[in-house]
Amino acid sequence: MAELVAAVGVPHSPHYPSQYPKDGPQDTPRTYREVKAHLDAAKADAIVVIANDHFNTFFMNNFPTFAIGVTEAAYGPNDQTKMPHYDFAVQSSLASHMLKTAMNEGFDFSVTQEFGVDHAMLVPLHYLTDDVKTPVVPIWVNTFSAPLPTARRCYALGRMMQGAIRSLPQKLRVAVIATGSFSLEIGGPKVDPGKRNSVPDLEWSKHLHRRIGKAEFDEIVAEATPEQMWKAGNIGGELLNWVVLLGMIGKDKPRYLADHDEKDGHAYAVWRWD
């Protein structure tokens, strides 16, 4: 049977690969290396990545609430992110099993069988893997094109995904990466004058960081209303990627939780069960 051996939450700024070499001394690559050490120790055979698309894989004429990639291989980045190009394998048996389980459990994934991925998935994989050699299962969540899915629905999706992994007959060690910011505004009215981006609701981001450290996931689900996420910035809905992850975790506290990043309104966390 397959087993969930690790779960991590990280940011995915498209500027990181050009700003910070993997082995750089700055806080960002150093923290990614801390997270990567946990993933390496978990010895995963497959990685499920939960992220949002930025109108690169999908567009407004067909922008799904939840989507899954079911194929043999994919590539990225499919946007203008300055980083290495990767061709990577998709763990198709796990992806197919998750799709079938979702349908049986009342979750109607959109399915794509030919696709690239943008920086939201590839920046974390760039820092957290060795050249994306581990097969991936891509999961997309709509986090900024209203109406967004509710936090309750995203948490339930995570519970379903956990069950799908554990019911796969194949022996497989699975890790999960969720990626996104808690409070961030890019190029919008909440950006401070003269800046490209801002953190509109720093207290909300710090509050979420504390909640995660205490495994207060039900409280996060209750508090993550559309109004609150919008107050946190036009990128604030990326919290929903994390909420899916929290649904997969259960009630465990993180084994590793980096200091809250006040400059960019995000966090790094690791859970392990290996």
Predicted regions, residues:
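Flexible, D/E/H-enriched segments
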Residues: 1-45, 57-156, 167, 189-274
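Catalytic metal-binding/acid-base residues of hydrolase active sites
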Residues: 53-55, 182-183
